[in-house]
């Protein structure tokens, strides 16, 4: 009888556990944000079905969070999503189905950190110069460069200032932006949240409240993309530092998120890329370093040239639709990008039937019996400098495809290109990879679907 009771109790517990398990969603709507720290120990949203869809209302990155000391990572990305079936050592394929800018205006510019307002890192550990509080709550009082004030002592608290800044109005058709003058910037600043369209759950101070207007009448074409898109690192870190360049700020840092170089290389997933080709139509294959992957999104930009050379571009709110798929037993050190064909380097674009025919004829003339059937792949690398980032991309590609680094260098030179994602240290190493190799590493079907 006692044994029967134990069995019954066990069955009841198992039954309760089963009931409490949330059912995986086919479509998940995301409008919640982290406090700037990507922490694998925190509960994720979801679960989402393998093959499911994420629709996210993202909030601006960079400047807004940088002006909000309670956000401890420099960005305000979405809470990570748990993808059903994703295990450590797998990969998650993310297809960007659509990106829509919702902001009507934004402000940006080149930054300079203010030395008495942070400890070690102005993105992570802000200190009020008045009352000395760490991560102080703030309010926006009025408009202009001194508008961000400590809630406790009313001291100006923003850890950054703009050395040259602008306010840009955005075309409602999503095609153009124009920088406005002093009066236009003032008009936008006085109705800041309405113009920025920050989601209701976002806590950032709107950057347009600063009303910068150093550039007036500058036209810019809109081509929105995601500066942050990826999976959760396996150790808690500030979201904007999830890459080898900004992540280097964490090495030996005087705050709780300090890393060694070895830890950074092991745990980061390079979700903060700022690669302008991560736009509608592109696919990215991301490493899974925690159970469920933890897909997160943010830092949408209205436009950007390669390098984001000013340090910041036009941060906007928007609506993003993604489709995710788990690739089992595809272990990656960092992301792989499959850009739209028009975004590929000339040398890496898929060959036409006519080009292949002519290549076969030339090969036969010199006794080459078979030419490669190959597809373009962009391997992302990051590091403290662009040189280190390039070395990282080449090293990752060599390990993944079981090639020597000199072979990768040759292939990237004649069938691809090294392109800057972000200065100082994110690049893509793009080159044509043989179909046989892609099949061996289990990513051929994903790449064929993108380019076939």
Question: Model-derived features: where do they sit?
Answer:
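Redox cofactor-anchoring modules in respiratory/redox and cofactor-processing assemblies
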Residues: 261, 289-373
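Short, charged amphipathic alpha-helical segments flanked by flexible coils
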Residues: 284
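N-terminal, charged/glycine-rich beta-strand/loop interface patches
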Residues: 2-276, 287, 291, 348-351, ...
């Amino acid at each position: 009888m006692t044994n029967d009771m134990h069995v019954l109790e066990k069955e009841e517990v198992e039954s309760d556990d089963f009931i409490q398990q949330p059912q995986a969603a086919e479509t998940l709507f995301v409008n919640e944000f982290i406090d700037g720290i990507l922490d694998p120990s925190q509960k994720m949203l979801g679960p989402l079905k393998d093959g499911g869809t994420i629709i996210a209302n993202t909030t601006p990155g960079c400047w807004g969070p940088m002006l909000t000391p309670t956000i401890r990572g420099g960005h305000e990305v979405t809470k990570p999503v748990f993808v059903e079936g994703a295990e450590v050592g797998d990969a998650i394929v993310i297809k960007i189905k659509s990106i829509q800018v919702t902001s009507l205006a934004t402000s940006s510019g080149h930054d300079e950190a203010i030395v008495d307002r942070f400890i070690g890192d102005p993105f992570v550990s802000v200190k009020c110069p008045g009352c000395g509080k760490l991560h102080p709550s703030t309010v926006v009082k009025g408009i202009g460069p001194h508008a961000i004030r400590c809630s406790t002592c009313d001291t100006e608290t923003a850890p950054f200032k703009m050395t040259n800044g602008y306010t840009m109005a955005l075309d409602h058709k999503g095609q153009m932006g124009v920088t406005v003058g002093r009066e236009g910037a003032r008009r936008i600043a006085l109705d800041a949240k309405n113009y920025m369209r920050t989601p209701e759950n976002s806590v950032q101070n709107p950057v347009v409240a600063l009303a910068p207007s150093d550039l007036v009448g500058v036209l810019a074409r809109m081509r929105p993309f995601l500066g942050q898109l990826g999976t959760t690192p396996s150790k808690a870190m500030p979201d904007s530092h999830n890459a080898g360049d900004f992540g280097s700020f964490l090495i030996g840092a005087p705050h709780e998120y300090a890393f060694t170089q070895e830890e950074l290389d092991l745990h980061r997933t390079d979700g903060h890329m700022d690669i302008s080709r991560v736009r509608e139509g592109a696919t990215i294959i991301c490493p899974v370093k925690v159970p469920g992957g933890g897909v997160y999104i943010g830092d949408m930009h209205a436009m950007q040239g390669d390098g984001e050379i000013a340090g910041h571009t036009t941060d906007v709110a928007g609506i993003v639709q993604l489709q995710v798929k788990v690739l089992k037993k595809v272990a990656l050190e960092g992301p792989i990008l499959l850009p739209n064909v028009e975004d590929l380097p000339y040398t890496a674009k898929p060959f036409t039937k006519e080009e292949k025919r002519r290549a076969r004829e030339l090969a036969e003339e010199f006794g080459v019996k078979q030419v490669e059937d190959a597809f373009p792949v962009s391997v992302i690398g990051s590091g403290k400098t662009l040189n280190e980032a390039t070395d990282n991309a080449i090293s990752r590609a060599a390990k993944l495809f079981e090639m020597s680094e000199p072979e990768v260098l040759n292939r990237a030179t004649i069938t691809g290109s090294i392109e800057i994602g972000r200065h100082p240290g994110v690049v893509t190493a793009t080159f044509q990879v043989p179909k046989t190799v892609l099949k061996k590493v289990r990513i051929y079907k994903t790449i064929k679907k993108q380019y076939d």
